[in-house]
Amino acid sequence: MMKKMSVRVSGDVRPSKALHLGLWVVQGLLGAMFLAAGAMKATQPIAVLVDTLGWPAAVPAALVRVIGVAELLGGLGLILPAATRVKPMLTPLAGVGLAMVMLLATIFHISHGELGALPIPLVLGGLAAFVAWGRAAKAPIAPR
């Protein structure tokens, strides 16, 4: 038996508590992961990143830094606007942005024959897209 994702209350459809909770859990974990990964790419010496990740050797150092800043901002965007209810429409936009970064990472890894690296950007991109969809369409957060 499947549970419904929403309940009808006097003509209005409200998302279930499970969906809200699931979105918050994904937002928190994904936000923390992108904050850590972004901080690493934005601040660590490129030589350290090459030793750790490998792929930064194949791209300009400036691109590695831009990716790091994008991941930092995206990680913040997944959490802060929704948590503070200040411009909460930025949360689904952060999800879309991070999903795009992960799509580009997937394309990069495929083009470099790094098929073993694909699960991470595919899963993270899917989770970011889930947050974008959930917070834009199914369980938006109302602004203050």
Can you name each region flagged by the protein language model?
Residues M2-R144:
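Membrane-interface extramembranous regions
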